[in-house]
UniProtKB/Swiss-Prot annotation:
Name of the featured protein: Olfactomedin-like protein 3
InterPro entries, per database record: Olfac-like_dom, Olfactomedin-like_domain
Signal peptide: 1-21
Family according to the record: Belongs to the OLFML3 family.
Glycosylation sites: N248
Span of domain Olfactomedin-like: 134-401
Any one GO BP annotation for this protein: signal transduction
Residues in coiled coil: 22-101
Length: 406
């Protein structure tokens, strides 16, 4: 071994001494850190075990309480359903008792035409009607037609309130239903998903036919009382008029219509027994009875009390009639055929006697689908709102003075 090699070995040995000392200190440091981590991990495990035990204890305490709360909730729900059923039953019983024993009306009524049990006064019959407004117009022609859309079934009603907001639309689908659709404006009704824009108003008793009317914030409609048409009993072939407050959603008045032996007034619309109408003069009812099963009858109603003020036997036949409406105290009856063809006003009756049959126009309706299930006149717009085999249609009317010649 040469002197250079010995020198190199001595240098390497001098370097290895400090490196071994540093490695020893590093190992001791790592061992201390690992011991600290193990201690903290043990503490975390102890805390987790303690928290898990506390959660189990809390769960064991809460489960019985939740079971008790669920049982109490079910008991309250059952009790609420029972109370609701009792309230509904009481309301029906009170409503029936009111129709059977109404308060005496504060009007003078001819004893010969006094209503029977549950009815209000029948009023004067076949006397000339005294107009309360200066309305003196009659139809000259049905000028135009606009089909809005198709909504609902073949029979129904859509209308506006002639005394309410000018834009609001009311839709009553079907002949035996209890839910009306209310649209804020006509544009909402014409949308593809119109039902989503509508609010729903549910009435306490289903209506009969398509003779409903919205007037002055109220929904007027006919319902079958116990023993009404098709139900047997002493009220066979009678109907009850309901006055329903649309905002409060309550029945504010009701009365059995003072006519016995009611039959459908329109030969082509068998589901409607009383067809309510509104014009410049107020509230009217079109109906028919077995006493004269060939012609229509007209009644003037008090919208506040549902009293029948006057009644008339009209010369308008029931056969092939499909709908009717009133303008300025004059009844206009629309006739058609089966299968449906082009409808036409073929009979009119002026309760005031101003418009004679010779001066009355008998216009045709524009060509359209199916047959009219309902027609509603809006005196503010001078338009007809028609339900035609599921289509909602607006007819614009051209007017003239009653005294003018055709």
């Amino acid at each position: 071994m040469g002197p250079h090699t010995q020198l190199l070995i001595l240098l390497l040995l001098s370097w290895l001494g400090p490196l071994q000392g540093q490695q020893h200190h590093l190992v001791e440091y790592m061992e201390r850190r690992l011991a600290a981590l193990e201690e903290r991990l043990a503490q975390c495990q102890d805390q987790s075990s303690r928290h898990a035990a506390e959660l189990r204890d809390f769960k064991n305490k809460m489960l019985p309480l939740l079971e008790v709360a669920e049982k109490e909730r079910e008991a309250l729900r059952t009790e609420a359903d029972t109370i609701s059923g009792r309230v509904d039953r009481l309301e029906r019983e009170v409503d029936y008792l009111e129709t059977q024993n109404p308060a005496l009306p504060c009007v003078e009524v001819d004893e010969k035409v006094t209503g029977g049990p549950g009815t209000k006064g029948k009023g004067r019959r076949n006397e000339k009607y005294d107009m309360i407004t200066d309305c003196g117009y009659t139809i000259s022609q049905v000028r135009s037609m606009k089909i809005l859309k198709r909504f609902g079934g073949p029979a129904g009603l859509w209308t506006k309130d002639p005394l309410g907001p000018a834009e609001k639309i009311y839709v009553l689908d079907g002949t035996q239903n209890d839910t009306a659709f209310v649209f804020p404006r006509l544009r909402d009704f014409t949308l593809a998903m119109a039902a989503r824009k509508a609010s729903r108003v549910r009435v306490p008793f289903p209506w009969v036919g398509t003779g409903q009317l919205v007037y002055g914030g109220f929904l007027y409609y006919a319902r079958r009382p116990p023993g009404g048409p098709g139900g047997g009993g002493e009220l066979q072939n009678t109907l009850q008029l309901i006055k329903f407050h649309l905002a409060n959603r309550t029945v504010v008045d009701s009365s059995v219509f003072p006519a016995e032996g009611l039959i459908p007034p329109y030969g082509l619309t068998a589901d409607t027994y009383i067809d309510l109408a509104a014009d410049e003069e107020g509230l009217w009812a079109v109906y028919a009875t077995r006493e004269d099963d060939r012609h229509l009858c007209l009644a003037k109603l008090d919208p506040q009390t549902l009293d029948t003020e006057q009644q008339w036997d009209t010369p308008c036949p029931r056969e092939n009639a499909e709908a009717a409406f009133v303008i300025c105290g004059t009844l206009y009856v629309v006739y058609n055929t089966r299968p449906a063809s082009r409808a036409r006003i073929q009979c009119s009756f002026d309760a005031s006697g101003t418009l004679t049959p010779e001066r009355a126009a008998l216009p045709y309706f524009p060509r359209r689908y199916g047959a009219h299930a309902s027609l509603r006149y809006n005196p503010r717009e001078r338009q007809l709102y028609a339900w035609d085999d599921g289509y909602q249609i607006v007819y614009k009317l051209e007017m003239r003075k009653k005294e003018e010649e055709v």
